Amino acid sequence: MQRAHPASTQRRAFLAGLALLAPHSSWAQAGTPASTVTTKPIPSTGEQIPLIGLGSWITFNVGNDRVAQDACADVMRAFFDAGGRMIDSSPMYGSSQATIGHGLARIGIGKGLPFAADKVWISSGARGPAQIEASRRLWGLPRFDLLQVHNLLDWEEHLPALLAMKAAGRLRYVGITTSEGRRHREVEALLRSQPLDFVQLSYNLLDREAEERLLPLARERGVAVIANRPFREGALLRELARHKLPPWAAEIGCDGWAQFALKFIVSHPAVTCAIPATSSVAHVRQNLGAALGAMPDAALRRRMAAHVASL
């Protein structure tokens, strides 16, 4: 199997502190049974979030099908019960935002859940605020935790607006997104020039271009990284399912290829969390299992990547 490519003062103080710690000593385990998943800090604030989030691309785009909406709500309930927090969506994702709102209303989630991440995706800066408000109403939340400029669309207008929302206390974090290896040079320039809290990009066992420049730069700049497309929309797992999981995967508690793939991603020092999407309760529980137990060190990560490349 071939990989796609070979290869403010508060923030500075926080990063300096991290530099004094062992590579993974900033990872935390929450103390209650429902939240024993491993977490990592958001560099700009130190707030801890679980290593595994929940994406909604395709899987939550179920229209007005109430049975499917309820099934997605069950996935969300299982996600929260297993210690998950971040749910990510976008106006681009069809009815996914409304599905999330239905699920949150049905479950009756309390304060602090979810960590709501959405995006602005419209080719007009003037229309951005209206789109954001429409998205907020679909979720049924008082505000978002994180808003991202989706695929850098009209970022020159949207990014200043999001930063103004944050300064006014109407938003906690600001980010940008890209996917499938596109526009990495532009993302790099924005990481260097803009006060970003998050960057979202594609990173998985095969798509590893971000390792070369973006992941090291995000770590240097104190920007949290969300990894999207961890399974290549399922194609990676379908291919891996043709092969047996190597016995040494048990060293880090993997009980399947999904956990193998996710542990590889979130064990990268620069990656804050991954956001696999699923419409299966069993799968969301398996995915959250990747945030439990031991994580691969650098040597084991190399072994994991080499093994998959050899298949």
Residue ranges of predicted features:
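Structured C-terminal cap/extension of enzyme domains
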Residues: 42, 198, 213-311
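Active-site-proximal loop/turn and secondary-structure-junction residues that shape catalytic pockets
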Residues: 58, 91-93, 120-122, 153, ...
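N-terminal binding-site loop/beta-alpha segment at the start of enzyme catalytic domains
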Residues: 2-113
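Short, well-ordered coil/turn segments that N-cap beta-strands
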Residues: 49-52, 84-85, 110-114, 141-145, ...
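Generic structural signal for well-ordered alpha-helices
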Residues: 39, 76, 97, 101, ...
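Conserved, mostly hydrophobic/aromatic
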Residues: 42, 54, 87, 100, ...
